[in-house]
Amino acid sequence: MERARKDDDRASEVLGALRSQLPEHSPDALSEFSRRLLSRVPSDRLEEAEPGLLGEQAARLFRLIEDTPADEIGVELHRLTNRPHRAVLFTSMPDCAFIVETLQEMLAAEGYAILALLHPILSVGRDADGRVTAIGDRVGSGSRTSATMILFEGLESEGEADLEAEVARRLGQVRLATTDFRLMVEDAARIREDLESLKTDLDWKVPELQEIQEFLEWLRDGNFVFLGYREYDILPGDDGERQVQLRRG
């Protein structure tokens, strides 16, 4: 009962802060944003670490989501006035794999201690000017936005700009890798089919080709994370020897 009351109080605080700081926005959109923010990951640690912080920072995250075009990456770092060694990192970007893992590993490698992390994934509806008008399961273009709010400590006196830039760079790499991943999986399937067509002409190599096909199937079935690959063409050389040439693209 006590836990439920605290959750209700926290939800009311966040929604009240959102409506106070974002009065021009749809109450329904703010209410749904508040619900999803609190339900994705328990917010107890954030509230315990910085009492009264959640409502104000929720409004900051909402603004970042709104100010970041749906297909771009937004990063903002806010240092806490009363505890300058602590800060809240906000990010907004198209949903993909490895976002949270990348941020956690990066902050840990830089020597920062994560105190709390919230990670809502939202479907966002916007008007012609890009303003958020609705949040739900299937609104807007249907694409999902992944947002994070991370409270951490250990920030140096002048580290905001460099950290923001590095977070944006890392998330850009994550997006490239995960976007290319699907294309590389499709290419693995294409290569497998190309090998199938070779079996007729190279019947003495069928066992070897079959083994390669099985390996490609194993990769495609989620046993490997594609980060990149190269293709080569084997061409006749001027001296009669075959040459290997890297294929562009």
Map each language-model feature to its residues.
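Catalytic micro-motifs at enzyme active sites that drive phosphoryl/nucleotidyl and oxygen chemistry
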Residues: 77-81, 103, 132-140
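Glycine-rich loops and low-complexity Gly/Arg-rich segments
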Residues: 114-117, 140, 175-177
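Charge-rich interaction surfaces and accessory domains that mediate macromolecular binding and assembly
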Residues: 1-93, 105-108, 120, 149, ...
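Extended charged low-complexity segments that act as oligomerization/scaffolding linkers
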Residues: 125-152
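Glycine-rich phosphate/pyrophosphate-binding loops
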Residues: 111-125
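Amphipathic alpha-helical segments
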Residues: 99-111
